Amino acid sequence: MRNAIIGAVLIAAVSTLGDFVWAGLHLRHRVVYGLAHGTLLFLCMGAYFGSLKKTTVMGAIYGAGIGFAAAGSFYLLAPVAGYSVMFFVWAFVWIALAFVAGAPVLRGVLAMIGSGLGFYLISDIWRPFNPEGWDYALHFLSWTVAYLPGFLALSWRPSGT
């Protein structure tokens, strides 16, 4: 449980930093920025899950690939399916992360469901968004809520293992 909480909090901080960069630099939503954002975010997630297996570098590499593929999938599918495809992509990255975490696919599915619901619940955090106010604290808490079910599912180990 401790690893799940630490992971969710760390990656929530990375996501909040990403929100700050997008807002603080007034970045327009361009494919190259989205690809970079997804790659860096999932590089961090992969590194964390990899570190739990003492394969940090490989986890980071796989995580970066997952993030790039996820962001690329979003940008390919969004013009056809709309922005709601973001929920679909978000859900399926957890199955890929199960591989990085060394977790069974079933736990990837549980992570997909739990974190998918969490992401759906927090998905309105950008509207309205006040980058000068307390919104970053709300973003951090919201991201923690969205990530925690996935981290719980993927980092849980039965007693004695």
Would you name each region that the model predicts?
Residues M1-T161:
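Juxtamembrane/disordered regions of integral membrane proteins
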